[in-house]
């Protein structure tokens, strides 16, 4: 009997009982005590007989309900027991298959969450097919296409390389991957439209995964250049998969108009995420593949540039660290080199918004060569952009990080060699005020690198052509260096630069030298006057204290 039936019966009993005179109809009824009280029905008030009968009705109903539930549970338990016995009997007849399935499941389930795949791989039940599928070279020609597809399907099985389990299956998969790469190298028209989805599925199942992250102590000092990269443990499989996918991308059999349905924007976003891998071998393959895709799939070019720009935005404004910035900049250097003239506003915005702000990143040392090359490519395409690049670098100048200052000076010299006189004239004052500060920098590498600017003939020519404005800025810093700098090499370079300036315009040099001496004397007098005033204030304070 259900709870609803019990409630209905209770309501019916209540209605019937209210119409009876319990004192006459049930004269010998004795109630059980309620709430710890004792006595007969009269002890509990006028409603005690009704409550007693209701309790008896509820007790009987509850007992029936309990018996019904027990009976039904017993029947269900018997059914489950018989079913489990039947299942055990059937599994016992195929114990070998279940054991293989457990082993295959273990093979495809990573022990560490960092090695889990971002794309769903094929079920592990196909791992036993590595040994059962015949060799491609042994199959009849008419069956090789289906066999090729079957081998790609079984190669979508992913193994966990964080342990030594399934060594035979791992080696069998590696041999199968090598076999399909060999088949692609020796077979014409092997990438037809029907197989493209299988290719993308197999490649994605293997390479798209959650990248390993290194847990670093935030308080521990470490130099990124000294850190050993964390190599991918699954590289014996990944390398062959990347090699296979590279063959697919560069194959003449692959029509980009058809393949773009499979190598789509979602695929490209996942591919770009892999550039953050710590393994330089993987990033090198990714760089080659992405460059080939950009060259072949023209419909994806604009999207790829925007996606790379988004990666740079995350590096600049969020993480400040990314392992693949250098490789992405290397690809961009080739892309910028192919820009048509005049440059589109889209390409200029990419420079201003995404490339130049990369100078702010703390890890600049890991990719500054590629970034400097991109800057040079833009200036070669449009010399007017030199003003934007140099003034932005001066705005982002790393005042307190001397190692980054040296990198900035290297890039400044390379950019100045490509700068035209009109752009140089616009920024010469702010530029050489910064260089004057660098000349007098106590860090000898910064001072030395700045003085090396006079070894570049084109920069010397630009300086001499604007010497009326620049000599007064530079000569004072050079004289200060010659008297105060501690490094002997910097002293030698300083005297060489002074000699070059004197030979370029002796009259102007003497005039600037005289002005510098007058400024020093005036500064000395101001310093003496300042010291005298402080002395007077000190004496006034002492007199007030004594009083």
Residue ranges and their predicted role:
Residues 57-391, 395-399, 404-406, 414-427, ...:
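Alpha-helical solenoid scaffolds in large eukaryotic transport, assembly, and signaling factors
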Residues 101-141, 145, 444, 451, ...:
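Intrinsically disordered cytosolic tails
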Residues 193, 215-216, 284, 405-406, ...:
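Intrinsically disordered, low-complexity regions enriched in proline, serine, glycine
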Residues 439, 443-476, 489-497:
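Alpha-helical bundle/repeat cores within regulatory domains of eukaryotic proteins
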């Amino acid at each position: 009997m259900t709870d609803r039936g019990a409630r209905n019966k209770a309501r019916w009993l209540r209605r019937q009982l209210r119409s009876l005179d319990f004192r006459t109809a049930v004269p010998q009824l004795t109630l059980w005590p309620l709430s710890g009280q004792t006595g007969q029905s009269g002890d509990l008030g006028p409603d005690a007989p009704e409550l007693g009968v209701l309790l008896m009705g509820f007790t009987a109903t509850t007992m029936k309900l309990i018996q019904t539930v027990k009976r039904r549970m017993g029947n269900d338990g018997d059914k489950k027991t018989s079913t489990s016995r039947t299942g055990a009997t059937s599994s016992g007849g195929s114990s070998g298959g279940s054991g293989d399935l457990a082993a295959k499941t273990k093979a495809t389930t990573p022990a560490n969450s960092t090695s889990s795949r971002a794309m769903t791989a094929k079920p592990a039940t196909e791992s036993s097919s590595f040994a059962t599928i015949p060799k491609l070279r042994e199959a009849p020609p008419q069956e090789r296409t289906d066999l090729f597809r079957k081998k790609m399907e079984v190669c979508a099985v992913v193994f966990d390389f964080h342990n030594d389990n399934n060594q035979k299956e791992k080696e069998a998969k590696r041999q199968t991957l090598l076999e399909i790469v060999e088949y692609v190298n020796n077979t014409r028209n092997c990438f037809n439209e029907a197989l493209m989805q299988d290719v993308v599925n197999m490649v994605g199942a293997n390479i798209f995964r959650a990248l390993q992250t290194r847990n670093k102590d935030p308080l521990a000092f470490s130099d990124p250049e000294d850190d050993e990269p964390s190599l991918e443990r699954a590289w014996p499989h990944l390398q062959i998969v990347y090699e296979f996918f590279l063959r697919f991308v560069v194959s003449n059999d692959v029509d980009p108009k058809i393949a773009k349905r499979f190598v789509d924007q979602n695929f490209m976003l996942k591919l770009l995420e892999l550039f953050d891998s710590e393994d330089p071998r993987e990033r090198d393959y990714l760089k080659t593949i992405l460059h080939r895709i950009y060259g072949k799939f023209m419909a994806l070019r604009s999207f790829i540039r925007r996606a790379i720009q988004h990666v740079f935005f995350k590096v600049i404004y969020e993480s400040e660290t990314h392992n693949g910035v250098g490789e992405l900049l290397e690809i961009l250097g080739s892309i910028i080199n192919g820009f048509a003239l005049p440059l589109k506003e889209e390409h200029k915005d990419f420079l201003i918004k995404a490339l130049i702000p990369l100078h702010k990143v703390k890890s600049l040392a890991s990719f500054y060569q590629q970034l400097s090359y991109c800057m040079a490519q833009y200036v070669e395409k449009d010399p007017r952009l030199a003003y934007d690049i140099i003034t932005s670098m001066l705005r982002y100048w790393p005042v307190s990080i001397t190692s980054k200052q040296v990198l900035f000076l290297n890039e400044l010299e390379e950019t100045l060699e490509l700068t035209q006189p009109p752009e140089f004239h616009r920024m010469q004052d702010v530029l050489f005020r910064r260089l004057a500060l660098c000349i007098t920098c106590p860090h000898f590498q910064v001072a030395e690198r700045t003085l090396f600017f006079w070894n570049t003939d084109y920069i010397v020519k630009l300086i001499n052509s604007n010497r009326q404005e620049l000599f007064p800025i530079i000569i004072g810093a050079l004289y200060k260096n010659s008297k105060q700098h501690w490094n002997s090499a910097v002293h030698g370079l300083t005297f060489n630069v002074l000699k070059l300036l004197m030979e370029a315009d002796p009259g102007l040099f003497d005039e600037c030298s005289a002005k510098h001496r007058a400024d020093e004397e005036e500064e000395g007098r101001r310093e003496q006057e300042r010291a005298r005033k402080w002395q007077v204030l000190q004496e006034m304070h002492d007199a007030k204290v004594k009083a």
